[in-house]
């Protein structure tokens, strides 16, 4: 498409990851060349909040910040553990400090993978951390950028019970029938480039295009396993969705960008007038 027409929005990526420390300028240049108009950058733990805010200032109007506490904490794989309310207590004052600059609260959610949430106590604490962040998002009138690995139904139920309305479920791994409960509630689902090699292809078939957004989850969930993903690969998601839905890539880009604008109202201000 080049620079003509509507740009793409990467609704969920991790640009503060160390994987991008050495060449972020180049990565963002390639994203712009691939017609990406906005990058929604999410946090996982309070230790990266300042870095994300600095990136959003450095690439103002292109990198849009979300702050939140992920259900899995710990920077390196061997340190990873289920979130606690203490993790949230450290994060909340920083989120409050930046509340006016945020696009959304995220990445938040539930992760019931057995290695992180093997006990009912851990699951319950994850729920409490999520409930408090849903309440925070409602108070600040911000959308939620949500993780739900191995916890599709519990996550959608909790969001519903708490009255969350603007919700993005990223890289949803639950059953399509569970996803449809989210569609009924008005939630959006973002599809990463790994869709071309994942078991979630039925999900794309069943979700209406009006409920789909695009994401990369960079540096994870790329088209090839073990290869660093980056925002320019978002076109792979768009092409795959177009193929499954039997529509043009242009239509997928147009509809998913409109969906992103509905979901993240602050994006409107960034559009060229």
UniProtKB/Swiss-Prot annotation:
Which interval of the chain is the signal sequence?
Answer: none
Question: Which top-level enzyme class is recorded in the Swiss-Prot or TrEMBL entry?
Answer: hydrolase
- One Pfam family per UniProt: TatD_DNase
Activity regulation: The 3'-exonuclease activity is sensitive to the metal ion present in the active site, whereas the AP endodeoxyribonuclease activity is observed in a variety of divalent metal cofactors. 3'-exoxonuclease activity is suppressed in the presence of Ca(2+), Zn(2+) and Ni(2+).
Major location, coarse class? nucleus
Question: Which molecular-function annotation in GO is an example for this chain?
Answer: nuclease activity
Question: What's any one GO cellular component for it?
Answer: nucleus
Cofactor(s) essential for the protein: Mn(2+); Ca(2+); Mg(2+); Zn(2+)
Q: What does this protein do?
A: Exhibits 3'-exonuclease activities and apurinic/apyrimidinic (AP) endonuclease (in vitro). Show preferential AP endonuclease activity on double-stranded DNA substrates and 3'- exonuclease activity on single-stranded DNA.
Tell me the PANTHER family matching this sequence: DEOXYRIBONUCLEASE TATDN3-RELATED, HYDROLASE OF PHP SUPERFAMILY-RELATED PROTEIN
Q: What is this protein called?
A: Putative deoxyribonuclease TATDN3
User: Which source organism does the UniProt entry give?
Assistant: Bos taurus
Query: Taxonomic lineage per UniProt?
Result: Eukaryota, Metazoa, Chordata, Craniata, Vertebrata
């Amino acid at each position: 498409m080049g620079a003509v027409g509507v740009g793409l929005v990467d609704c969920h990526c991790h640009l503060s990851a160390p994987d991008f420390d050495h060449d972020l300028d180049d990565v963002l240049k390639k994203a712009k060349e691939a017609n990406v108009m906005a990058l929604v950058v999410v946090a996982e733990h309070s230790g990266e909040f300042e870095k994300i805010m600095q990136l959003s200032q450095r690439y103002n109007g292109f990198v849009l910040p979300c702050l939140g506490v992920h259900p899995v904490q710990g920077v390196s794989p061997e340190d990873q553990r289920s979130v606690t309310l203490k993790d949230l207590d450290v994060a909340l004052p920083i989120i409050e400090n930046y509340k006016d600059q945020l696009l959304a609260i995220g990445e938040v959610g539930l992760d019931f993978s057995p290695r992180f949430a093997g006990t009912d106590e851990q699951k319950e604490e994850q729920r409490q951390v999520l409930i408090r962040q849903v309440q925070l998002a409602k108070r600040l009138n911000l959308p939620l950028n949500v993780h739900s690995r191995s916890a599709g139904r519990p996550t959608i139920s909790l969001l519903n019970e708490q009255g969350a309305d603007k919700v993005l479920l990223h890289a949803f791994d639950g059953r399509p029938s569970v996803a449809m409960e989210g569609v009924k509630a008005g939630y959006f689902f973002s599809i990463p480039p790994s869709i071309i090699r994942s078991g979630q292809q039925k999900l794309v078939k069943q979700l209406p295009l009006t409920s789909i957004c695009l994401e990369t989850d960079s540096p994870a969930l790329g088209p090839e396993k073990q290869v660093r993903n980056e925002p320019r690969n978002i076109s792979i998601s768009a092409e795959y969705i177009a193929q499954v839905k039997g529509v043009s890539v242009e239509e997928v880009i147009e509809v998913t960008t409109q969906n992103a604008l509905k979901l993240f109202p602050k994006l409107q201000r960034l559009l060229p007038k």
